[in-house]
Amino acid sequence: YYGPLSLLALFVVWAVGLIFAFTILQYAAGSAINLAPNQKPGFWSDLYMSGTTFFTLGLGDVTPRSEVARIITVFEAGLGFGFLALVISYLPVLYGSFSRREVNISLLDARAGSPPSASEMLRRVALRQNPHAFEQNLNEWEKWSAELMESHLSYPVLCYFRSQHNNQSWLAALTTVLDVSALLIAYGQGELKWQAKLTFAISRHALVDLSQVLNTPPREFEEERLPPNELQELRALLIAAELSTCCPDEDQRLAELRRMYEPYARALSDRLLMPIGKWAPEAKVVDNWRTSAWARISSADVQPAPLTELEEREHF
């Protein structure tokens, strides 16, 4: 809840700061306000005057008495209207950007698992589509990365907004896209390799720029995300999908590409508390669309039948 609560707290800080600023101006102008009989003007009456003016309450129990006080009051009332209009227009823009971001992240559950991984995306998408269809898929993620960079650089608070499921996040999705693109650049061929380069470029651009905005220097992973045995499995997937011949000489190229983005992903993961998975999924991970909280709550004594090994590994 840090993202939404911090945004609300920011609005409160802005409003309180402006009210106190105009309070000080009224106090410096001599507290020239009309009060009820037997009441003396002072700092607290100026604060009340400033609050009612900023939120345009118009109660009429306190009014400015001098020309300077009237000018300050009019200016504060206009600024209060502008502040409310800014808040009203700001929230829908934030929600629209958040909603567009989450659409593709939700689609990843069926396409790359939850949490997403490069090997699952290759197994589920690349093995079941022709190279042209997979190229279109990468093109969609290129556009998503560009929109992510534009919206999150303009509104950095969106970086703290969580996805609907705790095993999904925009950072994990972006890292998965970079993993797949790096694989195709290192081992791929033809037009698909060119599209992978374009997707990798904008995705890394977004990752690095957001790291700079959030002041998170790159950090190396303490644990290897891609052990040699998993790399061998990925090469086998690429060959099975007819996307590459996977020459082992390209392993160095993949390592160079990984060094271009993994340290930034690690830094953002630590800063935002958003875990990043490995290149291959953890064993016995079930997609979100196959689970239900109601089943776990309503059947305390009845355990669901275990999935067969084929059902665990197959998408549908």
Give the label of every model feature segment.
Residues 112, 116, 130, 137-140, ...:
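Soluble C-terminal extramembrane regulatory/interaction domains of multi-pass membrane proteins
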Residues 20-31:
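C-terminal TM-helix exit segments that contain a strictly Trp-centered aromatic cap at the helix terminus
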Residues 119-152, 162:
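Acidic, Ser/Thr-rich low-complexity segments on the non-lumenal side of membrane proteins
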Residues 1-7, 61:
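Cytosolic juxtamembrane amphipathic/interface segments immediately preceding
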Residues 81, 94, 144-147, 180, ...:
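Generic, well-ordered alpha-helical scaffold segments in large soluble proteins
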Residues 95-128, 136:
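Membrane-proximal helical linkers
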Residues 11-14, 22-23, 36-103, 179:
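Pore domain of cation channels
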